[in-house]
């Protein structure tokens, strides 16, 4: 099996060690693993908005942010650009999860391609359950706009695809 260093080249700003550090931080107890634990422990309990946000942050937002940071690092992003991509990923990840929870309540199993209503059946606290459908839609729009605002550091031609992605995710039906 090849070593990580054989698959990833250093850039002017980032080394293989930086990528490994990013990956380790994302997978750790405060991010993906921690988010999954919070999610499982939250079943059959009434979580507060900050607790639900912590689940979203630790799972969807962390995963999306890390993927985007890897792309930015491989493109030799400056510190300011990396921060902008981080903000974009964080907010887009939260918006994605809110929309996912809305779709779990409103879309069919056939449309989703997965079992609809799983959150209700597991008695999970979700954004729509806590603040209603209109509040959840508003939250998703606000988070998407915050994600788009974070990209303003980049020239228009460099952000077009990410803007399209953000708008697609906000308006998706599955």
Would you name each region that the model predicts?
Residues 1-174:
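All-alpha prenyltransferase/terpene-synthase fold signal
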């Amino acid at each position: 099996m090849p070593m990580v260093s054989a698959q990833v080249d250093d850039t002017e700003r980032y080394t293989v060690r930086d990528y490994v550090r990013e990956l380790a931080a994302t997978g750790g107890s405060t991010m993906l693993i921690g988010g999954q634990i919070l999610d499982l422990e939250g079943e059959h309990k009434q979580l507060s908005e900050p607790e639900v946000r912590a689940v979203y942050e630790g799972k969807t937002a962390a995963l999306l942010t890390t993927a985007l940071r890897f792309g930015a690092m491989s493109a030799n992003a400056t510190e300011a650009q990396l921060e902008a991509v981080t903000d974009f990923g964080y907010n887009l990840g939260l918006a994605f999860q809110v929309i996912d929870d809305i779709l779990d309540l409103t879309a069919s199993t056939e449309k989703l391609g997965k079992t609809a209503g799983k959150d209700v059946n597991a008695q999970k606290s979700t954004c729509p359950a806590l603040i209603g459908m209109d509040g959840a839609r508003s939250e998703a729009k606000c988070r998407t706009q915050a994600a788009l605002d974070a990209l303003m550091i980049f020239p228009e031609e460099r952000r077009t695809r990410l803007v399209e992605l953000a708008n697609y995710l906000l308006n998706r039906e599955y």
